[in-house]
From Swiss-Prot:
<dbReference type="InterPro" id="IPR001405">
    <property type="entry name" value="UPF0758"/>
</dbReference>
<dbReference type="InterPro" id="IPR020891">
    <property type="entry name" value="UPF0758_CS"/>
</dbReference>
<keyword id="KW-0645">Protease</keyword>
<feature type="binding site">
    <location>
        <position position="192"/>
    </location>
    <ligand>
        <name>Zn(2+)</name>
    </ligand>
</feature>
<dbReference type="GO" id="GO:0008237">
    <property type="term" value="F:metallopeptidase activity"/>
</dbReference>
<keyword id="KW-0482">Metalloprotease</keyword>
<dbReference type="Pfam" id="PF20582">
    <property type="entry name" value="UPF0758_N"/>
</dbReference>
<dbReference type="InterPro" id="IPR037518">
    <property type="entry name" value="MPN"/>
</dbReference>
<keyword id="KW-0862">Zinc</keyword>
<dbReference type="GO" id="GO:0006508">
    <property type="term" value="P:proteolysis"/>
</dbReference>
<dbReference type="InterPro" id="IPR010994">
    <property type="entry name" value="RuvA_2-like"/>
</dbReference>
<keyword id="KW-0378">Hydrolase</keyword>
<dbReference type="InterPro" id="IPR025657">
    <property type="entry name" value="RadC_JAB"/>
</dbReference>
<dbReference type="InterPro" id="IPR046778">
    <property type="entry name" value="UPF0758_N"/>
</dbReference>
<feature type="domain" description="MPN">
    <location>
        <begin position="108"/>
        <end position="230"/>
    </location>
</feature>
<dbReference type="Pfam" id="PF04002">
    <property type="entry name" value="RadC"/>
</dbReference>
<dbReference type="GO" id="GO:0046872">
    <property type="term" value="F:metal ion binding"/>
</dbReference>
Length: 230
């Protein structure tokens, strides 16, 4: 059956019809990818679902790795050209933006778990470390998210002067620091401990409270406050 065009399949087995009848959650990852790809490779006798399955196999079924893939990596699948690769990249990017913009609906943060819930989709797929600062007002309401750095963290890159400049400029009452560990393990390094100590001291001098520093891994997080280190 996989060598036939999807339009020739029984109606209840076609991804689009299945989605319309049963909802998107009823589709497999390969079927969802097929809808993004729209067509297969007729010359090779591959349906869009076949291409979706090959993509998943190429990345060991890991959607996180697939989301991180560059266009040239996606095109290594025979029958998957630039247009299809761009569609996949666009779909994953749109999902990330949706997660990021959920932040705008929040009135205030109440716990490290809530921070993790809102940011792990955005940060866990990055191959580089990103350091973010959340600016909050006196009622712990988010006013802005600032990206401080991208790349391996060290004390010269994450310097208190650069980190607190937006908070001072916008009269923030408090800040929350967030960064990711591309390895997936959120356990803090010695450098993470030292950076947190320095930033907390700077916050005390400036009168800007550091509410937490949260490290995001793959499905887990580390909170300096919950661990009694801040």
């Amino acid at each position: 059956m996989s060598n036939n065009a999807i339009k020739d399949w029984p109606e209840d087995e076609r991804p689009r019809e299945k989605l319309l009848k049963r909802g998107a959650a009823a589709l497999s990852d390969a079927e969802l990818l097929a809808l993004v790809l729209r067509t297969g490779d007729a010359a090779a006798g591959k349906s869009a679902i076949d291409l979706g399955r090959e993509l998943l196999e190429r990345f060991d079924g890991n959607l996180r790795e697939l989301a991180q893939a560059e266009l040239n990596e996606l095109q290594q699948i025979k029958g998957l050209g630039l247009a299809k690769a761009a569609s996949i990249k666009a779909a994953f990017t749109l999902g990330k933006r949706f997660q990021a913009r959920r932040l705008e609906t929040l009135e205030r943060f109440t716990s490290p778990a809530q921070v993790f819930d809102f940011f792990h989709h955005e940060l866990r797929d990055n191959r580089k470390e990103l350091f973010l600062t959340l600016l909050l007002d006196g009622k712990n309401r988010i006013t802005r998210k600032v990206q401080v750095s991208e790349g391996s963290l060290n004390q010269s890159i994450v310097h208190p002067r650069e980190v607190f400049a937006p908070a001072v400029r916008e009269s923030a009452a408090a800040v929350i620091f967030i960064h990711n560990h591309p390895s997936g393990d959120p356990a803090p390094s010695r450098e993470d401990h030292e950076i947190t100590r320095r930033l907390n001291e700077a916050g005390e001098i400036l009168g800007i409270k550091v509410l937490d520093h949260i490290i995001i891994g793959d499905g887990a997080y580390f909170s300096f406050v919950e661990s009694g280190l801040l």
